[in-house]
């Protein structure tokens, strides 16, 4: 107020000397009043009581009257919960990670990227995200969230959600329903035992599915309708059979560390873009494979190490890396790589690992150098 009085006197003095100009001389007063309004706002904590995390709005006491707040200040009053950080230069992001939170703070409407990872959150109540329907990126990994304490339709209204991170929690069931907009789903390191056929229904935009390190023993046909899926990581589970049907767009399939002992005929033919197949540490035998199971022209890398194979399975001449170490292979069959061996017909194989088998170094046939002329590493 002191500076206001000085400025006011200065302005009046100037006017009395006949130097008054309405446009110029009222500008300083308008500026001061604007500054006064802006600086008078008191930044109160979002929550009145930290023990009531789901009381989303502040209600004044009955015997008091809420002081009117300018519109611009009302917008900023819900800008960020006190438990989190909302960078001014990234106004659509809210960082609440690594703060020992036991509950989900309120998510303001405009938020698109929200990070709750590395906390002790155990539950997600129904409607927790109903106010934040613009969310695109939701990080909930490394918490203690259980399926029993999660709302049945907690993600259903998030029509713009593209990435959901829930790995490293205590989930025993697949969260469902999930929004069709989803592109990445991270559910590794949970306790999920089954993926129902309709669990991923309608997720036509899903490109990456991470379900490793669970207790899944059955996948059914849950992958079949995922027409955009590029990567499926189902490693470190309890699968005894491969999923029923693969998506056409699939490029990477990880099934290592399961109990799979057989693969149906032409299983990989339905995925013409498949590049990487990893099935190490399973129970595969030659009896459980057809002659051309892995003879797919698109596959570039095939890992069948640490299984129960006794013979080298037939592979495509386009294959570049083949890992067969730790099996029971006792013969080197060149027909597994080249059906015809001559100058024009040869394998593109660059890396071949056969160490840890029953095969001997002198078992390599004389025409092997011609067939495997591209190989830079052959370990026996």
Swiss-Prot record:
Localization recorded for this chain is: Secreted, Extracellular space, Extracellular matrix
- GO CC terms on record? extracellular space
Glycan-modified residues: 89, 131, 170, 205, 295, 345
Q: What top-level branch of life does the organism fall under?
A: Eukaryota
**Residues of the LRRNT domain:** 71-109
Alphabetical UniProt keywords: Disulfide bond, Extracellular matrix, Glycoprotein, Leucine-rich repeat, Proteoglycan, Repeat, Secreted, Signal
Q: How is it modified after translation?
A: Binds keratan sulfate chains.
* Chain positions of LRR repeats: 110-131, 134-147, 160-180, 181-202, 205-227, 228-248, 249-270, 273-293, 298-317, 318-339, 348-371
Instruction: Tell me one Pfam family matched here.
Output: LRR_1
Q: Where is the signal peptide?
A: 1-18
Protein function: Affects the rate of fibrils formation. May have a primary role in collagen fibrillogenesis.
Name of the protein:
Fibromodulin
Species for this entry: Gallus gallus
What high-level taxonomic lineage is stated for the organism?
Eukaryota, Metazoa, Chordata, Craniata, Vertebrata
